[in-house]
């Protein structure tokens, strides 16, 4: 048995479910989740708009509500995503070149490949994630630092992909 006592649920669990508590908790999660999603959507829109002002940057995936509120993937022509990530890290900004579940492989992202990106576009992409704990000030910081990094790396890159 999971809980000892009465014979509910064929002896596996004692007691009666608190249905009103379950329904109330579900509603609280829904309300809290909706406000978090709206907040992250605003941060995401601000970040995307700022990123697209950087020359030769492409948003991977759709721009609107058809994407997750907490995830942005962009490609920077002629700059390896790993190089951008290294510089971002030096400024205290976390990014990745793929999902956490593919971090131990050198394979290109199957998701980016499935939406039609070339090998070069995939290798020049980075992923930025947002949470309900991020602030507008942090988004502004990324948008202040990242264009400088991109400009510096493009000057250092003699070969255009």
What is each of the regions a protein language model found here?
Residues 1-161:
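Pyridoxal 5′-phosphate
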